[in-house]
Amino acid sequence: MEIKRLTKEELQDFTRLKGCKIENLYYRGDISLLQKPEKIIALIGRRNADADVLRNANRCGKILAESGTVTLNGLAVGCDTAGLEGALAAGGKCIAVMPCGLDYIYPKCNDSL
């Protein structure tokens, strides 16, 4: 895990964060995804979705990854998980926005993602 304290100058380099009032950014993985002008799409949905909806979320994640689109979500169970699993299975890049530090993954079942 890396901890990055952003200066005002550094914040300008993170094009995806412009206008956000952030002092600390905790990350694991490729932080440059926040700097690149790539396509990013939020892939979210119901937590208690049925099997068909989960299959479709997984398929959407895969299609987005294959097109070079970065997927973003909140790492929740259900559609968020299915979409991330589809994107990762296709070799895609993903961003998970979490309300807590990286030392406490919630929900725990998504620790491997």
Annotated model-derived regions:
Residues 1-113:
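Glycine-biased, small-residue-rich flexible motifs in mid-sequence functional cores and linkers
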